[in-house]
């Protein structure tokens, strides 16, 4: 059940318009720069900024000393200029004095080494000590700014899970054991789910449950254990977000809460279908990848965001005006792409266009990351594009674009965070399997065909669509397989991609032939029975790099040996693959 949709108002006469701005870090600059910042914001049409995302150390420079003076001044300066503030909980990074006093709040990597402080999210989400300090900060912020008219929304944390998604500390171990006990009830149920009779790993009690730390270069983690650790990491960070949100809501219940998801090219790390239920409006950080498919990937990510927002407006909390700085090679955007990408987000349902960050940093890890105001200042082609974009967004807002909804397609591509996690397993036939990338490829194929598909979480209700597509949905439960069967029986079309329905929710193989999901129900629906699959590619010694079908289509990764039930399945294309032995697959 989603929370009631609540959108942050702007400081305009009617509180409406398309929100435009970005992360603003005034504490990186001397106060004599602030007036110039506000002047340039007004010139560019900026009407909202996110403040204090990484400012805990400035707000609480020592354990028993608080300094809100600078934050008071900048919020007041912004608000009087008509610029709304999306105020952060400031917990994205903690002050160094906290780590010095309580080193036990640090997370650990899979080798058991503490993750040193000095970057962001260097804290364990399961640390009770860290949570106590973080919630104290949240309450202090709510008490001071909860009734401030210039603060129109709360920005909780920042990109939860980007740095501390996988924590192997003792805090995490203890929390994981409790999580497993709540999920399974008895150790017998856990042993069955994880298949611990393989390699002799049966446990006598939850006190013997381990997290999947490094076990040696040639060892593989139990895939069921690893999958549950993925779920656990998602749940622990979501619990931490909710604790922060609720601490502020107890004092300031009237303003909307959000946190920025990460859905883009290779960033879809959490089960955002769960997270979307806990925010008042959905927000996303989207960063482009170079190449001709960039705009298709943008539309694909936005299609998922639209579904997560249940068709309501959503927020682009971050994207880039030009180059980022965290890739091996960081290409700039070409002329017009900053405006094009932003308007594309609006066309896909976004009512807020924000960037990281307002002014390009002069120092630090992201100093070469592009911004609204570049290092060269206002007399630049980039800042002129920023002003052009601000004017375009105002025109769209004045025309009433805000609040409009996308028309639903008749086709849904189903996305499963758990299948995405499963395709990262080291125990699969190919490490090239990637559910999210296949979702993107299917989405692009629909665009190339002149139509558009929606992207809908598998766990949502998709029964109103005419067609559903499952691209590499490797994990299907019996319940979801039955939903597909009911959908097909009611006249819906089900398109099954390769490597779909091979395992259940515990990472157990569905037996009897592929795809065996639902104890063979999926296999019966399709009228086929796969005996064996084969991995293609140059890396697979002795195997072809591709197979060409009689229809002209080409496959380059996965080949199935399939038996067909002639009464229930019609063959549309065939192939012949000969080996040096007497065996042949056709």
Question: How would you label these PLM feature ranges?
Answer:
Residues 29-41, 264-273, 334-342:
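Short, acidic/polar
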Residues 20-29, 55-69, 116-133, 163-164, ...:
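The substrate-binding groove and active-site-proximal loops of carbohydrate-active enzymes
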Residues 36-39, 51-111, 244-251:
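Aromatic-lined substrate-binding rim segments of carbohydrate-active enzymes
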Residues 22, 41, 49, 78, ...:
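Conserved, mostly hydrophobic/aromatic
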Residues 16-18, 45-47, 81-85, 147-152, ...:
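Short, well-ordered coil/turn segments that N-cap beta-strands
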Residues 1-48, 402:
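N-terminal carbohydrate-binding accessory modules
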Residues 111-281, 285-288, 292-298:
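Polysaccharide-binding and catalytic clefts of secreted carbohydrate-active enzymes
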Residues 284-581, 586:
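Carbohydrate-binding surfaces of carbohydrate-active enzymes
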């Amino acid at each position: 059940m989603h929370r009631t949709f609540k959108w942050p108002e702007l400081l305009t006469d009617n509180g409406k318009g398309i929100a435009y701005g970005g992360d603003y870090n005034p504490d990186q600059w001397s106060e004599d720069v602030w007036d110039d910042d506000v002047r340039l914001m007004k010139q560019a049409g900026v009407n909202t900024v996110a403040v204090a995302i990484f400012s805990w150390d400035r707000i609480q420079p020592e354990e028993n000393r608080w300094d809100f003076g600078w934050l008071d001044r900048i919020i007041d300066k912004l608000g009087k200029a008509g610029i709304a503030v999306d105020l952060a909980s400031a917990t994205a990074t903690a002050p160094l004095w906290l780590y010095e006093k309580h080193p036990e709040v640090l997370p650990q990597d899979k080798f058991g080494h503490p993750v040193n402080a000095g970057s962001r999210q260097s804290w364990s989400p399961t640390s009770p000590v860290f949570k106590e300090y973080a919630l104290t900060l949240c309450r202090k912020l709510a008490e001071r700014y909860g009734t401030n008219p210039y603060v129109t929304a709360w920005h909780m944390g920042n990109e939860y899970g980007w740095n501390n998604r996988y924590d192997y500390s003792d805090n995490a171990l203890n929390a994981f054991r409790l999580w497993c006990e709540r999920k399974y009830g008895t150790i017998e149920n856990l042993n069955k789910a994880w298949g611990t009779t393989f390699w002799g790993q049966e446990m006598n009690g939850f006190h013997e449950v381990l997290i999947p730390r490094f076990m040696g270069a040639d060892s593989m983690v139990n895939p069921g254990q690893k999958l549950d650790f993925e779920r656990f990491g998602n749940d622990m960070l979501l619990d931490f977000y909710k604790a922060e949100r609720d601490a502020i809501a107890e004092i300031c219940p009237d303003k909307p809460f959000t946190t920025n998801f990460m859905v883009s090219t290779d960033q879809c790390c959490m089960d955002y279908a769960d997270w979307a239920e806990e925010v008042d409006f959905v927000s996303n950080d989207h960063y482009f990848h170079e190449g001709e498919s960039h705009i298709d990937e943008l539309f694909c990510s936005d299609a998922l965001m639209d579904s997560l927002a249940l068709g309501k407006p959503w927020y682009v909390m971050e994207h880039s005006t030009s180059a980022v700085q965290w890739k091996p090679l960081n290409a700039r955007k070409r002329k017009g792409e900053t405006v094009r990408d932003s308007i594309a987000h609006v066309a896909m349902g976004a009512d807020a266009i924000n960037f990281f960050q307002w002014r390009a940093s002069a120092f630090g890890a992201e100093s070469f990351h592009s911004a609204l105001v570049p290092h060269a200042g206002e007399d630049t082609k980039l800042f002129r594009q920023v002003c052009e974009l601000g004017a375009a967004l105002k025109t769209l807002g004045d025309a009433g674009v805000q609040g409009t909804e996308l028309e639903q397609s008749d086709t849904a591509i189903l996305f499963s965070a758990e299948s995405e996690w499963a395709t990262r397993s080291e125990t699969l036939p190919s490490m090239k399997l990637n559910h999210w990338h296949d979702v993107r490829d299917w989405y692009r194929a629909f665009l190339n065909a002149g139509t558009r598909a929606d992207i809908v979480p598998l766990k949502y209700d998709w029964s109103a669509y005419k067609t559903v597509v499952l691209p590499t949905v490797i994990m299907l439960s019996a319940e979801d397989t039955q939903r597909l069967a009911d959908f097909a029986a009611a006249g819906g079309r089900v398109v099954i991609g390769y490597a779909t329905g091979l395992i259940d929710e515990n990472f157990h193989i569905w037996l009897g032939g592929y795809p065996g999901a639902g104890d063979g129900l999926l296999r019966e629906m399709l009228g086929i029975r796969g005996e064996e699959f084969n991995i293609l590619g140059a890396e697979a010694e002795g195997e072809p790099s591709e197979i060409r079908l009689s229809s002209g289509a080409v496959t380059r990764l996965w080949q199935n040996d399939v038996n067909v039930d002639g009464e229930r399945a019609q063959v549309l294309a065939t192939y012949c693959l000969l080996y040096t032995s007497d065996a042949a697959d056709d």
